[in-house]
Amino acid sequence: ALESTPYMDLESRHTNLILTSTFNRKFSNRFTNKAGFTYTAMFYDMNLAIAPYEAQLLETVSKGDGNTSLISAYNSSSVGLSDRWTLNAGIYGQYLTLNNKWSVEPRAGLKWQATPKATFALAYGIYSRMEKMDVYFVKTKSTGNQSVNKNLDFTKAQHIMLSFGYKISDRMNLKIEPYVQFLHDVPVMADSSYSVLNRSDFYVEDALVNKGRGRNIGIDITLERFLEKGLYYMISGSLFDSRYRGGDGVWYNTKFNRNYVINGLIGK
């Protein structure tokens, strides 16, 4: 009789040490500036193994032991253009020492106080993220001990958002925020539907390339009543469409694409 073997053996230990510093200065009633940096030291020890089929021996899919760093810095200014117009603009950058990848991300927002009760705002920004550490240390049969994903670039996204806020009363606010997000340089498996945007397993076992895309379109609506006479509540709803393009060039629904979400909160 065949002896049973485990289907997977996932050993993963991670420790992050974070150093953050910020500097704020108010130059005038209409001009303030904020700058800062964050240094994140990441220590990892991973050995992820799976069996392709039942009763087969485990095969290593990701293995790494060491440390790396993510360094980020930003500078942001808020300028009161007039009594009704406010401009927020800045730049953010980050650098991953693991593979010497870096990104520069401009961000800006413009707010208009149309009336004492109504505000409109428009915001745009570029954002990026690194992947989970196990992704960078994937090993395949054809490459032996070589980490096939170590040179993956950041996943990047462009965010555009409109905002309308209305003060219904001293204790109640309404906010409506339509938005769109365009993602690019998303790690995907070549000629496959797989994308890290749709990751569901505890591990990744294939070589990836930064050729995927994603798109999120939606609108968030929030009604909030502030605490008064011991009662507080908030009702929020979202309508959205979330899709990604795999390495095969085909667009799919993400696993998060439920199209709507409704939440309620009440407290006394």
What does each model-identified segment do?
Residues 1-99, 113, 172-175, 234-236:
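Face-selective signature of the C-terminal outer-membrane beta-barrel domain
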Residues 45-52, 97, 117-160, 180-206:
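Surface-exposed extracellular loop regions of Gram-negative outer-membrane beta-barrel proteins
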Residues 180-182, 203-268:
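Gram-negative outer-membrane beta-barrel transporters
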Residues 21-25, 79, 102, 110-113, ...:
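Residue-level signature of outer-membrane beta-barrel architecture
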Residues 15-21, 69-75, 91, 104-108, ...:
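Hydrophobic, lipid-facing positions within transmembrane beta-strands of outer-membrane proteins
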Residues 1, 40-46, 94-98, 125-131, ...:
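Structural signature of outer-membrane beta-barrel domains
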Residues 35-37, 89, 108, 122, ...:
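Membrane-embedded beta-strand positions of outer-membrane beta-barrel proteins
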